[in-house]
Amino acid sequence: MRSLLAPAAICALALSTADYVRPAPQVIEVAKGIHLFITKPYGEAGLDGNAVAILSNDGVLVFDSNGTPAASALVLAEIRKLTDKPVRYVVNSHWHWDHWYGTETYTKAFPGVKVVAHEKTREMMAGPAIEFNRPGIESQLPGYVAMLEKRAAENPAAQPVLDEARFFLEQKKNAKLVLPTQTYTDTLTLKLGEREIQLRHVDRAVTPGDTFLYLPAEKIVITGDLLVNPIAFALSSYPTGWLRTLEAIDALDGAIIIPGHGEPLRDKALLHAHMNVMRELLKAGKDAKQRGLDADQAKEEVLPRLRADMLVMTKDDPKLNEQFRIYLVDWFMHRVYDELNGPLSDAIAPIPRR
């Protein structure tokens, strides 16, 4: 989940978006019968999470259902080109809006579909996530659209951006939020035709209830936002548990990793870079706090030691370097300090003031 606005904002503006057409997703066949769908971001309003379809001779499992009904409908249209089998399972990895707000597409098309998530994820979806999103509903996105309307009035070239934002807001306004119908605690193994599909939860990581999916026969791991290509998003994370979870993923016999955003990975270099950064931040944060430094001071002190792993993620792109410093290092270090101050609750932490 990443946005320059609130992560799950909705708008109540009555705007016509009939003429706006979303492009089809990029479809990547990761392995036989395993397809990744990468949908277009909603401009500055937010990214859309990856969706993955696992095909079998008895049906389909969809991992993560995108951030809007329109996005998931485009993904389903592509799935229908690949198979006439029904979608039997939708697994939502965590509560961030861009991974589950499109679930209604599947429950409408397949009334018997099972919607699966970790028990903590269902708890978050049912209440705290809604409250977390409220500022965007009430102020941030309406203000964003108003700004775009003013810009488009002055410069017609800005009209496509406005059209896209209006479409996004209408989608968020009208999305029917579908809660999981099946939950689990630690592991859940599903048999879907010829495939064995393992759902696993190790610890609180990015959220209290992160699910990753493992296909042991195919040696594929699907991570949700536990890993993002190129840079993970550490807001409200659980540092020690997140590292434990990545270590568990690393221990699997996984030849391919499909992240929560971005293209699939056919080696573990990006995974290891994230693990290295997290280990260093955990160690540096503890040491700095003992010496009386605050989280911002600790972050600045450790940044030079993170450069090699940063380059694995950013390839020294200036924009990505800045995202690395904010989304991963800054936010993770603040959560390290929160964790050092005592046990973390499941409550969603606010964005650190900068």
Where are these regions (language model features)?
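Active-site neighborhood of phospho(di)ester-bond hydrolases with catalytic His/Asp-centered motifs
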Residues: 63-65, 88-96, 116-119, 221-224, ...
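C-terminal regulatory/interaction regions
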Residues: 290-354
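Bacterial N-terminal signal peptides
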Residues: 6-16
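Active-site HxH/HxHxD metal-binding segment of metal-dependent hydrolases
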Residues: 80-180, 189, 283-284
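Conserved beta-strand hairpin/beta-sheet module of binuclear metal-dependent hydrolase folds
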Residues: 27-81, 211-223
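Core dinuclear metal-dependent hydrolase active-site scaffold
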Residues: 173-179, 183-215
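Divalent-metal (often Zn2+) His-rich catalytic cores of metallo-beta-lactamase-fold enzymes
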Residues: 220, 240-297, 301
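Active-site environment of divalent metal-dependent phosphoester hydrolases
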Residues: 48, 69-70, 95-101, 122-125, ...
